[in-house]
């Protein structure tokens, strides 16, 4: 069985090694020398003088000893500071609504030279076809695109209808792929803790690689048991003390700042010189509008330094070297001899002002990357068949019967959080006793034509209209919220016509919609085009009274039955805390 040293980026051929050594000794000219540059020392702090010598895709040497060394090409960095390329330790590319190729075209120029992706969104929809397409894209990328093999497809068996299953027998052949680093987030933490044998079989099969975790709010004996099984990290940490306990027990923290789940400000005080090797940065779910307006990993580094006063060498350490060490990627994460020449040149450390990005020793031309994206995307042969097999719906299909003076369970939405507590509301005949309650419905889209699951949502801010989407974790059925079933049906039927996507309806009309024809998750449009439509969608949501930063991303997590506490799947209202379905209406004897 191959180990991590045979993975992408981790080996150098003998001929390349001999050439690298000759350049290091000064016997042959470097392919490229970056002059007039300073290196941020991630190990000791401070900066070191250049130059940086590059041979092939590797760093041959650094420092004043190489002043005046011959090179085939020289670049004057103008006094810039060089830092290692950034690593996003956990994300779902599908959540950007871009293809892997379009994603690379906008994040690589922002210094993100390496990503570790879990493709469980597309695998839930179309199984291995989606995974093999992602791997094809990774093989042709300049960005180091690593894939974790999705561990929970479906997210939690028996709680939802999804488009595919991905059992261990199907997972095993992918372990040896050079772009696969391990097992993706093990969301079935109850199964791990209970010693469920099929779940433990998955951990055992990938134990020689990395075992990613998913353990929101897990503590005490349960957390100890989860870690004892071999799980190594978590990106779902929500509270400071929760993070402190996980670090103390040896768990690595992936500190997340996505478009909806924003945990960096809460967890940043944990980061210190001592524990920073156990802390990484990730985005999890971030859309192209946020990437265009705020940035990607660069935005997280900027916030750590400027808002939380983290020392620059520590901030850049958690953005690169920490993740490289965690995943066993020995040739990534530092600017040092023998490392892969993934380098970001900065005009300003605190502002993360990027001058130039190098991937494997090659300067990245952002415009050329964008221009070539469409052709490269076509060559990757993305799956094109329609995955939305649902007959149109009527207002009657989406009408939840309500009884006067009866109590109902509502899902409570919390801005910028994925947890959704249960809230009791009472129907008074002409409205609820609690303000800001709307209807929610989830319906499977894989051809079974099941009756929609109906429920109530509190604290969305929606005052009129309806929102619908086929981005709905993790099974990606159709989710819709609104006040009037007729408008909800209009939004859903628009998505059926589009083959999937996002839609806003107001005043009885479709205001704006974004078709997502690739698995109902992604568009073949450019990042800029998607960002413009997302901008229009966000404005339409604001016009409907919503103040959430990312209404569609928050809505996408209302169906995920592995994050507490109350969710609505295509099979009904699910109590995550007690692992069971429950009724929307609360019986009188228990009210």
Swiss-Prot record:
The keyword Manganese applies. GO terms for molecular function: adenine deaminase activity. Keywords: Hydrolase, Manganese. Its EC number is 3.5.4.2. It catalyses: adenine + H2O + H(+) = hypoxanthine + NH4(+). It comes from the Bacteria. It is an enzyme of class 3 (hydrolase). One of its GO terms (biological process) is adenine catabolic process. Gene3D superfamilies: Metal-dependent hydrolases, Urease, subunit C, domain 1. Pfam families: Adenine_deam_C, Amidohydro_1. Its cofactor is Mn(2+). PANTHER family: ADENINE DEAMINASE, N-ACETYLGLUCOSAMINE-6-PHOSPHATE DEACETYLASE. Homodimer. Belongs to the metallo-dependent hydrolases superfamily. Adenine deaminase family. This is Adenine deaminase. It comes from Edwardsiella ictaluri (strain 93-146). The gene is ade.
